[in-house]
């Protein structure tokens, strides 16, 4: 006879206690007066503080009505008389909703309601009035918090049933006991705690709850007796001991844009700040950390009265600005200068409004951190760095430290904290115990940090979190805890700690690798505008030195728009479609504004501080050649550093006999090349070095099925190569243009839904091979890459970081190397032997696949969540294949990459000082207009000395003067900033 499993039908002790706990919570609300006079008006938010109303009139809102629309705003008014029975009592507004609501009562901001809290305290702010008038503004997002979870649809759906609004009073005895039991039940249910203590808690909670007769008038007396029993028997017990030391830091992560547009973040931020300020009124021990200068700036602009209240709490030390940066940016894709400006404009705001320089960087949710960050932070007045995802989201390896020292690409060091548990918790005992057990630096790092507060869409700390925290000292089995601010934790545990471990390298996140590629157009425009604003600042500065006005405010406005759109859910592509459209609109505005600042000149200006000598395409209607559909000609500009010259079409054209084409083969002064019909290169013999560069696939376009699952826009899985989508040759490779400078071959490939045109150009006077791509992309769950298997024996690939390069292993000896199958790079990667190698230089791509001898440049993705239209449409981009002798540094790959990415600008300006030896990263006027600020970065890993014809100020990146000198010794990969008095 088969064994039949017996299903347990009786309740476990903790389940029986939990059931009665639910009964107890019904009695928290004492008096409950329905508010009947409620009206609502629906709207669509169109800017940060402007709305388009669907109707001119308010309509009645009654219990049972559907209200709110997806991605919709609603304005709600309500009015109620306060009966004599409720006067002189502590009154609350009770409203259970899935929306996010800001509440004013009798003209005063009293708090916020959202899915994490359902009531707002009124009495301290409105006194004891006869009548209360409510004005509420609510927002309802376009999707549920978690569409994977069917239960979340009912709680946080886009359309919801109005369950009524009430004026209520709270039974403080019930509420207090609820918090006691909630705290203890969390321990009883968690296997992280001592089993004997959990049994003790369950037994004694049962005894306490047995004192309450829920169905009789003696219930209030029983509740008081149960409260006393819990205190005297459970909380007083010290027979069980815990261990650990955990700092509790309150914060709220606020995504500027994600499943909502940036314009909605203004109200999300107001609601979050209001809630914390109101909690501070009631909990004198409460300290709260809040990041992103942009959120403070928007609060000051749109809600100045709340900002003034916030400033008072900042002065008290209870509301703590953290983060240093303007927003929480992605830390892989932005340029070094963009990351500097994030700190510069962030610190500028904090200094001007709070009189302080923030000494920490607070980036809990970013998708990995570039190796260039420590130097930037250190030179922006930041000593401490906080992130989180490496310890909680890695898919393969556990990041080995939580409190440590992070050493940057140039040797700069900052203290770093990567807390062992998620940055969104609700401060329950089990979460704190989990944090301590996961903490890896118990012997060297001091306390561990546990962040608490709801986040992503803001919200922050709740009354429940603070009440539970007040009970921690009564529970002997828990780690020791102390509530403190973020800066206090960092300074107490990290500053001067000589026992801390050191991490020297990038902080790579083993997840979200797809964000290097998703939303390709945003990444292309971001890079183009990063360089265009560099040009605009340099040109404007040189003009200002000749007496012209400097457009400082316009440049600042443009920079801030760029910085906002580098937020870690905008530039990486992990957002809904309206966010994408907002970013495009910002980029169009910035592009147009910068064009107006730059103007137009007869000559071409070389903003690079080295001679431009790479063959370049110049647009000209009379030209005989084309590039990206524009007519023009190819020539070597030979423009001196920071100088300008008129470029004209050469009078003499070379014969086209330099390129011998025979079917799918071509011979140039540099190479003998063999092509496949799809544009792949099957042979590339370098005549200069007498060596073959191809050893397998080379310039092969491949499209893969790309189904990472839940985190569609975010992730690429290691098995993406399992299924290759067949590419048909729509139009085989053929010669299309041949001139005295360039020879072009065109091939068109396709899938059932997409068309991909590749134009391969080879040149008479340059060894570069350019591949232009024009794509009409209509795929779903696909990843396009171009693959290279060079005939090079190297166990590492050099990858540009934007301010130096990083060497990454190509082998898979360890799980750490295997997990880095897709990494972020900037303008180029290079794989070389000591006497030569291959560089691939791009104009807008960031993802690089690394698999032993095969390297791949990620070109396009096609994801559906959270944006079903992601990347659909037309794309144009190019990359260079650049074989060379010697190393990447010997071959000046950085210079070639800068020339490829920074087009010549028409402007009649020049500069005598060319700052040889380092890359001119930025030139601008200081904020006070007193100095010309010049930023230079060493890109090739070499030491050097720079001498100046006059004394200059050495500055930090915040433009503070450090000292005067006429020469500077610089280290490999160092960024220096100098100030030249006007």
Predicted regions and their residues:
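Aromatic-lined ligand-binding clefts that engage carbohydrates, nucleic acids, or primary amines
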Residues: 87-105, 134, 605
